[in-house]
């Protein structure tokens, strides 16, 4: 039997079972749990390699083969960290296993044929496309920025640079819903829109759901009173749509207890649950312990650093149309920015009490930094708090597989479950839409190499188009063919409500993208949040703002230096 060293094998085919990989320049290390390929039967494309006619490529018709195979990829997902070939067909994930030619190779579960394209995954990490559930659609250029960061699904609301959209993620009314659904046809991104949920009568809310909204947004700037909360959730229950809420910072219509009471145990997604982005001051953070609350953070407070507090005050004044000359507006802003609750937010993420991370794009958050900020938070917590239970600390330094699974779930499967789109996206699983992101380990979470939408490359880091090879400078992110023409419409989804799909909004509005209805939003609960389902009893001292969870005081120092930062963005 011919043997090969681990180093040589990894250099040729990528890491295998037991090998460890560092993520970017963080302190996070993952270990390959399983290898679905077969030693000695690996497939690889190129001159003198395996995927050639009569060798690793079969003679079978396209109907029996995958359209694309990603070879020898290292999959990082909530369900595992494994090495495998990935087969894509018809825009979806067809198989995860062993690719090749079953006529001459054993154990083949992914058939390669003359109709198969190859993407080399050796030495690459593959993740599911990110899902950002807190989007202010202030400008369409956000969409490209998000896509190039590895986000493939955006959920939120807005109409452009209108004052209401600067502050709230709302696409209000049927007319705007139709226009925005038509506008997003131009972009290679899965998108779902939220309507305005602030009303005390059901009819004006219901008509927005029927017009295409996948959910509703309650925002204090429109008046998030207990009556509005109750009415909005009643419509959501009737239509199987989700509600996202930004609660009452000033406690005008009641304190956090009144808001929890208005929920009446019904499922709701709480935005920026720590409170710096808005919500009952100073103790909105305590809702993360409720069984019906699905809590998320926005990325400006991720993670807590020495700069976090200073930048927040200026951002807040702009985003919520506040006047620095008015004392009450200054007091409003200062009530939201609390170092103690921001520090506690880091720890609550690490312990799995906060389930999701999103951006709050151009409205205090950065649309292209959801993934970066998530992994910076994971790194900071690993450095300050050590290994999580379940992650070993052996003579080789151990690995962080469980922590990595916990954090990747925050921007993939958990937002998908929350908003009723997990049947389509949110993980690398057979049958799901093939929205995949390929990363070099050194650039993981920062700069993806390829972004696939619906099984086709939509964006990539590409060199000079006039060069003799693809790699010469300047290399920057450019849209690829899945972002063009009719392929764009076939490669991306528009999410709508079941009521809108039944009302045939696609034909009525002249939409070309594939429409997919959200479902299961009213039965999801905190216990369904993958790796992030802890429900602590949280209290906040009204004078010191100190946060205690299940009797434990939550405190940590701000970071003075972070990975995944300046060294990646010099050019």
From Swiss-Prot:
GO cellular component: cytoplasm
Pathway in which the depicted protein is active: Nitrogen metabolism; urea degradation; CO(2) and NH(3) from urea (urease route): step 1/1
Binding site for Ni(2+) 2: 217, 246, 272
UniProt entry keywords in alphabetical sequence: Cytoplasm, Hydrolase, Metal-binding, Nickel
Residues modified to N6-carboxylysine: 217
Active site: 320 (proton donor)
Catalyzed chemical reaction(s): urea + 2 H2O + H(+) = hydrogencarbonate + 2 NH4(+)
Alphabetized Pfam families for the sequence: Amidohydro_1, Urease_alpha
Catalytic EC class: hydrolase
Binding site for Ni(2+) 1: 134, 136, 217, 360
Domain Urease: 129-571
UniProt-recorded Gene Ontology molecular function terms: nickel cation binding; urease activity
Entry's cofactor comment: Binds 2 nickel ions per subunit.
Cellular localization per UniProt: Cytoplasm
UniProt cross-references to SUPFAM superfamilies, sorted A to Z: Composite domain of metallo-dependent hydrolases (SSF51338), Metallo-dependent hydrolases (SSF51556)
Keyword rRNA-binding among UniProt keywords: no
Disulfide bonds: none
Family affiliation: Belongs to the metallo-dependent hydrolases superfamily. Urease alpha subunit family.
Subunit structure: Heterotrimer of UreA (gamma), UreB (beta) and UreC (alpha) subunits. Three heterotrimers associate to form the active enzyme.
Protein's name in the database: Urease subunit alpha
């Amino acid at each position: 039997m011919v043997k090969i060293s681990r180093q040589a094998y990894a250099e040729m085919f990528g890491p295998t079972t037991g090998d460890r990989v560092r993520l970017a320049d963080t302190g996070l290390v993952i270990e390959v749990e399983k290898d679905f390929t077969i030693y000695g039967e690996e497939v690889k494309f190129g001159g003198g390699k395996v995927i050639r006619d009569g060798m690793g490529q079969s003679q079978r018709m396209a109907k029996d083969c995958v359209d694309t195979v990603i070879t020898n990829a290292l999959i990082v997902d909530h369900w595992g960290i494994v090495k495998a070939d990935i087969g894509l067909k018809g825009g979806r994930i067809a198989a995860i296993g062993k690719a090749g030619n079953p006529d001459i190779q054993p154990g083949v579960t992914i058939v390669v044929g003359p109709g198969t394209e190859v993407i080399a995954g050796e030495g690459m990490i593959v993740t599911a496309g990110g899902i950002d559930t807190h989007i202010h659609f202030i400008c369409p250029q956000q969409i490209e920025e998000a896509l190039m960061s590895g986000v493939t699904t955006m959920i939120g609301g807005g109409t452009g640079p209108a004052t209401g959209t600067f502050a709230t993620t709302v696409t209000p009314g049927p007319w705007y819903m139709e226009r925005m659904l038509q506008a997003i046809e131009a972009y290679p991104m899965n998108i779902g829109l939220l309507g305005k949920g602030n009303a005390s009568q059901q009819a004006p809310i219901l008509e927005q759901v029927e017009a295409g909204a996948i959910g509703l947004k309650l925002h204090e700037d429109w008046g998030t009173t207990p009556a509005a909360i109750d009415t909005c959730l009643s419509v959501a229950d009737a239509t199987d749509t989700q509600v996202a809420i930004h609660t009452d910072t000033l406690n005008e219509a009641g304190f956090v207890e009144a808001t929890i009471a208005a929920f009446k145990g019904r499922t709701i997604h709480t935005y920026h649950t720590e409170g710096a982005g808005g919500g009952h001051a100073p103790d909105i953070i305590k809702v993360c312990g409720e069984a019906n609350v699905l809590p998320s953070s926005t990325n400006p407070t991720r993670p807590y650093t020495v700069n976090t507090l200073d930048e927040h005050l200026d951002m807040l004044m702009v985003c919520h149309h506040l006047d620095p000359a008015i004392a009450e507006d200054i007091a409003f802003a200062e009530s939201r920015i609390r170092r103690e609750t921001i520090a506690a937010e880091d720890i609550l993420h690490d312990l799995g009490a906060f389930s999701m991370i999103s951006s709050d794009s151009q409205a205090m958050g950065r649309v292209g930094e959801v993934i970066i900020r998530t992994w910076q938070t994971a790194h900071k917590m690993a450095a300050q708090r050590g290994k999580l239970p379940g992650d070993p600390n052996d003579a080789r330094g151990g690995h962080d597989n469980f922590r990595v699974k916990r954090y990747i779930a925050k921007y993939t499967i958990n937002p998908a479950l929350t908003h009723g789109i997990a049947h389509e996206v949110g993980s690398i699983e057979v049958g799901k839409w093939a929205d995949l992101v390929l990363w070099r380990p050194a650039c993981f979470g920062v700069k993806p190499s390829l972004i696939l939408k619906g099984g086709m490359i939509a964006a990539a880091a590409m060199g000079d188009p006039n060069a003799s090879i693809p790699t010469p400078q300047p290399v920057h992110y450019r849209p690829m063919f899945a972002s063009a023409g009719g392929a764009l419409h076939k490669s991306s989804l528009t999410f709508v409500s079941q009521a809108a799909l039944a009302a045939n909004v696609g034909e009525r509005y002249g939409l070309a993208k594939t429409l997919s209805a959200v479902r299961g939003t009213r039965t999801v609960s905190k216990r369904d949040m993958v790796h992030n389902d802890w429900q602590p009893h949280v209290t906040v001292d009204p004078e010191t703002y100190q946060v205690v969870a299940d009797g434990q005081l939550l405190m940590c120092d701000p970071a003075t230096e972070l990975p995944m930062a300046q060294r990646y963005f010099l050019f």
